[in-house]
Amino acid sequence: MNAIFYKEWIKTRWYLLLALLVTLGFAGYSMLRINRVASMKGVEHVWEVMLARDTVFVDLLEFIPLLVGILLALVQFVPEMHHKCLKLTLHLPYPQLRMINLMLLYGLVVLLICFAANYLLMTVYMQGVLAPELYSRILLTVLPWYLAGIAAYLLISWICLEPTWKRHVLNLVISVLLLRIFFLAPAPEAYNAFLPWLAIYTLLTASLSWLSIARFKAGEQD
């Protein structure tokens, strides 16, 4: 397990540093927007705008976790497929399914660390400015966007691991349709009642990569 995690870390470490800086940058800028409004018109105006106009001030973050998840999957798995490393990896004296699961687990762990850092930054700042009901409104609104980032990572990993180009296209279409679910309702907290199911739905997408590996092992290649 440690060896697999180390191998994945070597491949992705510079991208992860960039992803962390970019996501924190966007989260920090969103907090500065709140600070600017609060400084110019008072905290009461921030509360009024949030309640009366359904504004959450963090709309810039909407597609950032999605892009981070997509790019992580590409950085992690495209070299494996391009250099034919996956075939060698799957012939190591180690359970194949467990190896792929560990590679995906690595990606999930580093994404969760990155996204948790975003949440920590936003929470620490907003606790000093907004009432708990208001900053929890923002945090719950952005949660589906971060779940979309995790789902995007798992779905693009599935596409990258697929050994045939025809299935690449089909898997891409399916992935776009599945990811669309995370962005159907633009209103703040629109997904609150659905969040547990959305989290389960996100984790279940990990099983799709097993289908690609089964096809790879069966010799399905272009």
Regions found by a protein language model. Name each.
Residues V22-T23, H82-L92, P132-L139, E220:
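Short, charge-rich amphipathic segments
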Residues Y6, I10-L18, L97-C114:
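Alpha-helical transmembrane segments of multi-pass membrane proteins
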Residues M1-E62, V75, P79-E80, L161, ...:
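Hydrophobic alpha-helical transmembrane segments
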Residues F77-Y106:
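Helix-loop-helix units of permease transmembrane domains in multi-pass membrane transporters
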